[in-house]
Amino acid sequence: GDLPICGETCFEGGNCRIPGCTCVWPFCSKN
């Protein structure tokens, strides 16, 4: 159950594994 990294698919409101990335559906992106 690892969190997605930048560039991977995520769910709205979800978290990303790497600090400085946020979930902007449908992908984790750098802030």
Curated annotation (Swiss-Prot):
- Does the keyword section mention Ribosomal protein? no
Do you know which InterPro entries this protein is assigned to? Cyclotide, Cyclotide_sf
Cysteine pairs forming cystine bridges in this chain are C6-C21, C10-C23, C16-C28
In the record, biological process GO terms are: defense response
Q: What is known of its domains?
A: The presence of a 'disulfide through disulfide knot' structurally defines this protein as a knottin.
Tell me the function of this protein: Probably participates in a plant defense mechanism.
Q: What is this protein called?
A: Cyclotide glopa C
User: Which species expresses this protein natively?
Assistant: Gloeospermum pauciflorum
Q: Provide the taxonomic classification.
A: Eukaryota, Viridiplantae, Streptophyta, Embryophyta, Tracheophyta
